[in-house]
């Protein structure tokens, strides 16, 4: 069984998108646009995250690696945009929608997970994530007079392997997909899997609320979220897969 809790932030439409197909599920956190959001007539990030989610549904299977599944989904959307957005190939990559993502695929004996950027997964008392993105968030937390300029500067370094501060993140050309973190763990004893965006991670700093397998649609969970909602203005999304009794 799959349950979802999602809530729009205060600054823009909800750019967290989630989905599942068969034994695979994901949460995508679209990056706030810093160089415009109207190549698709407005709300480009939200529309693009939904398009990637739809493409993932077409590509998921039990044969490919999760990074390959994501890569092909990204390339599908890129191909579509190349035909619908005038001068697409002349647009700097950092001006196009980008994202963080986490994906989980559940098999009979094991659970495969993939993370790119700062979304997270919680299973059986442990957090699984792409730690390489910590330095990017740390960079953006510098005390400077112009935060917006700092964030734009950071965004321009995405998927730049030649710059010492370059980093990998989800993008339409799929360049960063292979650099995401992916592992496989034994399924035994795991009864609940939680995937969530970085906004939700900010609220769930104390993961004890998840330890006993709480239902994310339970009023206890919702009350907890509302109690700590002040910690972030970002969108918050958590997707739960319950394995017990399957």
Give the residues covered by each predicted segment:
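PP2C/PPM-type serine/threonine phosphatase catalytic domain
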Residues: 1-246
